[in-house]
Regions:
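Bacterial N-terminal signal peptides that target proteins for export
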Residues: 1-11
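C-terminal segment of classical bacterial N-terminal signal peptides
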Residues: 16-25
Length: 329
């Protein structure tokens, strides 16, 4: 009898242990997190000076701010403060991680100028590359042709005029972190030039782009050292950027993938847009979806920087939008 009681007690304790273990397991069992696509809202929407030719050409992200460069063709409007210099001006503007303006600067001369790309050196200076219009050499006085002298049929025509400038002077502006120009470096070329990228490599900058005419263009590459000395032009093969491909960005422990236009996302069953929509998705190291955001407008560029997050530049109607999404790493 005593043996039976001990056996019964042992069985009861075993049952309690198993029940407690099962209960604990049920309480701690991981439940898959339901990820939804969140619509990103631009931190900054701007139409620059509101002129038809205004544009943002490039964007650069630091650990605390976002810089963007481009062209303005009219007088300054809020939130910008720098005054107009010439017909069209290059410019650089810097905003913080919330989209609030820090400073802006117009670049150029009284001629036409544009800014097309930007990089930073080790100190933190911004190096903005662009183009300035160089006045054409005048060999004789140019006058409008009188239509009545050569128009024997009496048809009304406009007087013929000769253009007095062209965008053939490549310019690099060195701007410090407070928005002051430190130096300007100029390189004359034989034709219309369009630098499309500038990158910093150890002790020098590498500038690439197109040069030639509207009929015939070729790629070029030129180097620039920290003292403003340009190397000789080197022919460079022009490679068209791929379209419709997925862009992967390493972001801390995670990986961000940018899809230029999708209707379905693996792992997010609730995502069912009616039209193709640009989306960024953050994946954990294990490959699980951690977060997802849809982006507004026509996306021009996407980048990520620790301290700021993901930064997307978009065309939204007649304006530009900069969306800053923190917490994707």
């Amino acid at each position: 009898m005593k043996f039976r009681k001990t056996l019964s007690t042992t069985a009861t304790l075993l049952l309690i242990f198993v029940t407690a273990t099962d209960s604990s397991f049920a309480a701690t069992k991981a439940v898959p997190k339901q990820i939804k696509v969140v619509a990103a809202r631009p931190n900054l929407v701007t139409n620059l000076s509101a002129a038809a030719g205004d544009q943002i050409s490039a964007i650069l992200t630091t650990s605390t701010a976002v810089a963007y460069v481009g062209t303005m063709e009219s007088s300054t409007v809020a939130p910008y403060t720098a005054q107009q210099i010439g017909g069209s001006d290059g410019f650089i503007a810097v905003i913080d991680a919330t989209g609030a303006p820090i400073w802006d600067l117009r670049l150029g001369t009284t001629q036409d100028d544009i800014a097309t790309a930007v990089a930073r050196d080790r100190v933190g200076n911004f190096w903005v590359v662009g183009v300035s219009a160089k006045p054409a050499a005048i060999t004789q006085t140019q006058t409008a042709t009188d239509p009545q002298v050569i128009n024997v049929d009496g048809v009304s025509v406009d007087p013929v005029t000769t253009p007095n400038s062209n965008l053939s002077q490549m310019v690099v502006w060195k701007v410090d972190v407070s928005g002051a120009i430190q130096a300007t470096y100029v390189y004359d070329t034989y034709g219309v030039i369009m630098p499309t990228a500038i990158t910093y490599s150890t002790t020098k900058f590498i500038i690439t782009g197109l040069v030639g005419s509207t009929i015939s263009q070729q790629g070029f590459k030129v180097e620039l050292d920290s003292l403003g000395h340009f190397s000789k032009f080197v022919s460079n093969k022009v490679v068209a950027p791929p379209t419709g491909q997925v862009t992967s960005i390493k972001a801390g422990a995670n990986t961000i993938k940018y899809f230029s236009g999708v209707k379905t996302i693996a792992g997010i069953k609730s995502w069912k847009p009616k039209v193709l929509t640009p989306v960024v998705v953050s994946y954990s190291r294990s490959g699980a979806v951690a977060a997802a955001y849809s982006l507004p407008g026509k996306v021009l560029s996407v980048s990520w920087q620790a301290g700021v997050g993901l930064v997307a530049l978009s065309e939204i109607g007649n304006s530009y939008g900069i969306s800053i999404i923190d917490g994707l790493a």
